[in-house]
Structures are given as structure tokens and as C-alpha cells.
Amino acid sequence: VLSTKELPPTPEGLVELERKKREEGPFGFVKDIGVAIVEMPRGLKKMALVYLFQWYAMNVFWQYLGLMCAVTYFGVNLSDPGYAKTEAFNDASGFATGLMVAYYVSCTVVALYLARLANRIGPKHVHTAALCLAAVCLVLLTRIGSPGHTAVLYLPMIGIGVAWASITGVPYIMAIEMIRKERRGVYMGVINMM
């Protein structure tokens, strides 16, 4: 932000924007979004499908991490009506919070370097590797620890954090390469809706 030079619109560009606003009315942006979705480049349509699955997977992960830890590593029995009030469940919840800290820290650190890596080897390769890493780490999360040895679970959480850094940034790098310069704004909004 500090090193990016702002390019203000030209007077002619401002006149054109005002004309377009008058012609399209207050809801012209809805038409613009609809046209963008219909005319979406094939690569972005493929990305939309990937987004569907990655966001679903991450939502399931966020919702069930604590329960998975409770059942798999802390011996909580979900059929017990008072399981949420047990000490084991509280311990599992605290442990899951610690895992999420590792996830967020790794995501933050990796995000600082991911764009450079994507520029060097290509965003498609970086994102594919990150999603594969996430898949492996999600499986490992339920397989590599044991009730007495839960510290090893921080390793897959770091991998999932790496994937999250990619999920929240690299698709925009890929998209910018597919979109005409004058349509970038609307398509960035469409990607945010995915």
C-alpha cells in the first residue's frame, strides 16, 4: 500500500463513469455482475468449482475440529448427554484452540512469502500443492496422534495453515491473469462471492 502509486482516473474517464452511472441507474451494478458471471472466462469457472469444495472442506474443519479432538484424543463420548460439561471436553476445546493458533500463525507467516513463490513457479502450481497439502493434513489430523501424544497434531495444523494462506490469496493472482484489465474490479467482487 505504501509503495503502490495511485493512478487517478483521467477527466475523460470520470466523464465516462458519470455517463454510465446515469444510463444504468442505481442498480446498474447488478446487471454488470450478471454479465460478468455469464461471460466469465473458462478458467474462472473451473476456479469456482474448486472454491466450492475448498470452502466446504474448511467450514467442516472449523466446525468439527474441537469435537474431533474431544472424541479421538480426549475420550469424550458424544452419546453421553452431559459430554459438553466434562473436564475432558473442556481440555479438548482448549487443545483445539491451541491447534488453531498454530494454524493462524503458519498462515500469517506463509502468506508473506506466497506471492513471491507464486510469481517464481506459477500460482497454479503453488495452489495445487497447497490444496494437496491440506487434503493430506486433514487426513493426518485424525490418524497420527494418540490420547497421550497430541503434540504431533501441530504439524498437520501448520500444513492446513499453509493451505489457508494459499486459499485466501493465490486464486486472486490466478484470476488477475485471466481477466481483461477493465473488468478486474467486477471479477474480484465475483470471486469474493464464491
Q: Residue locations for each model-derived region?
A:
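Loop-to-transmembrane helix entry
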Residues: 75-105, 152
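Intracellular juxtamembrane helix-capping segments at the cytosolic ends
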Residues: 166-180
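Hydrophobic core of transmembrane alpha-helices in multi-pass small-molecule transporters
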Residues: 150-166
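Loop-to-transmembrane helix entry/capping segments in MFS-fold secondary transporters
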Residues: 93, 179-191
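Intracellular loop-helix junctions on the cytosolic face of multi-pass helical membrane proteins
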Residues: 1-60
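Helix-to-loop junctions at the C-terminal end of transmembrane segments
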Residues: 109-123
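C-terminal ends and interior cores of transmembrane alpha-helices
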Residues: 132-147
